[in-house]
């Protein structure tokens, strides 16, 4: 930087008159460096502040005889630019608390993700204990979320992103798979213990790997396949001795795994620049349209005949409506926080967090509902969760290595 300033002032130095002493004395030349204004650069790296120039280049030693320059020299000094970053900490703009401690924000996201997920699963199962209509409840989950999204758009939080016909065509398969996976998950939740459903749903990585290998034609490393072996073994052990086992709950959870696998496949084809909040809002709206018809056809007559009246007789109108509203809010918010958390952390961190979330849900559901599980079921569940953890870590590491190669 100093070399640039000196070179830009070369023409000015040549114009300064020489002061010569009488004969017999040595000649001293006054060297005055005058900095012309440097070209501003928005990256802040090429800015030269006035206080940086003065000590080294612009100060004249007034105790020296050469300070007797009769012609005044005008010195141009750069003023600090408030719009760009400063070279010193003293000129930096004030940093907010959350910007200064981002790990606290990320920790809060994880906490709320876990908390809302656990509360959703517990409240959801309590509703099914007195209102066993999973198709209707699934539609309520999405309906409450849609109302929440529409309210957010109405006040500009967030601002609604535009939707065109091309994006709509891409999102319809994603929303259909999301709706099918959501409904079948709830059918399983209503039929068997929450802990058992989540144990079956831990097989989802196996279906993802199989779909990637045989449908998308992607090569899956042998290490990933080996890491899935404990998952399959653990789920098999847990299923054989699960006290609440029935085929409806088991098959529904398996269909949910397949549905969410295809949702991932279609999501990759529907990659868009739309932010995750708006994208999830549109998926929720379309998914709700898919969930309403089966709820009316399969459960409508029973609901009108005795479903609603039985639920109100058991818990009362206020609690019944309140439970449906809050379970829908918890469902939407925990899914939204899961997406927002993924945006804040690396895939490896999110993978670990997702595994721990399933452990929390299984553990809390056993404690809250007092589900009795056999020793073999407990061991099988632990093996399955451990296998999912290993798979998630290996997959996340592979993804990070791929991104590192692309950025290089």
From Swiss-Prot:
Origin superkingdom: Eukaryota
UniProt name for this protein: Triose phosphate/phosphate translocator, chloroplastic
Source species: Flaveria pringlei
Membrane topology recorded in Swiss-Prot or TrEMBL: Multi-pass membrane protein
Chloroplast intermembrane side: 83-102, 157-213, 299-376
Keywords attached to this entry: Chloroplast, Membrane, Plastid, Transit peptide, Transmembrane, Transmembrane helix, Transport
Range of the transit peptide: 1-82
Family per similarity comment: Belongs to the TPT transporter family. TPT (TC 2.A.7.9) subfamily.
Gene Ontology CC terms, in alphabetical order: chloroplast membrane
One Pfam family in the UniProt entry: TPT
Main function: Mediates the export of fixed carbons from the chloroplasts into the cytosol in the form of triose phosphates.
Subunit structure: Homodimer.
